[in-house]
Amino acid sequence: YKDKEELKAEISKGFEKYIAEFDSIPEALKDIRVAEVDRTPAENLAYQIGWTTLLLKWENDEKRGVEVKTPSELFRWNQLGDLYQWFTDTYSHSSLVELKDQLKGNVTSIQTMIDSMSEEELFQPHMRKWADDATKTAVWEVYKFIHVNTVAPFGTFRTKIRKWKKATL
């Protein structure tokens, strides 16, 4: 990304394409599992809500001077399967409308978070302790964490929900 505006534009573009896929899914089918896809529509959204919520929490906690535990206080990086199940248990019981609204709110908050940061804070290494602590060997700038929790999964999970729709609708 050349700057924060390009990052924000890619997040918006990816999110709008991703979230639109859910408009044609009836509420009654939100928990239907198909063999071809690893997540139901509700689980698909719960995963996105979970990661975007954590991303916002990492930044907010550091700003408040709270020690950040990545990926969360409850789980370590070698427990991602359990974390994903926690996302499902925590969020997927909500309606599709509620899930979409919650994710939209998180994406809006991430855009605001980006606006509040300087280009240096976003694109230079070692600008956030939580970003440094989250990776043992690699050096990740904050924008990479934003990308892998927004733009990247919005693309891959859009493919998954399209596959689910093809098998179900």
Question: Model-derived features: where do they sit?
Answer:
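Active-site rim elements
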Residues: 2-7, 89, 93-100, 143-147
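Extreme N-terminal tail/first-helix region
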Residues: 1-17
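Charged, low-complexity, helix/coiled-coil-prone segments
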Residues: 1-4, 41-58, 96-106
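Short, flexible helix-adjacent loops and helix caps
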Residues: 23-30, 34, 122
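Structural signal for well-ordered, non-membrane alpha-helices
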Residues: 15-26, 52-56, 60, 104-118, ...
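Acidic/histidine-rich alpha-helical segments that form the ligand environment
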Residues: 79-124
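Short, contiguous alpha-helical
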Residues: 31-82, 125-169
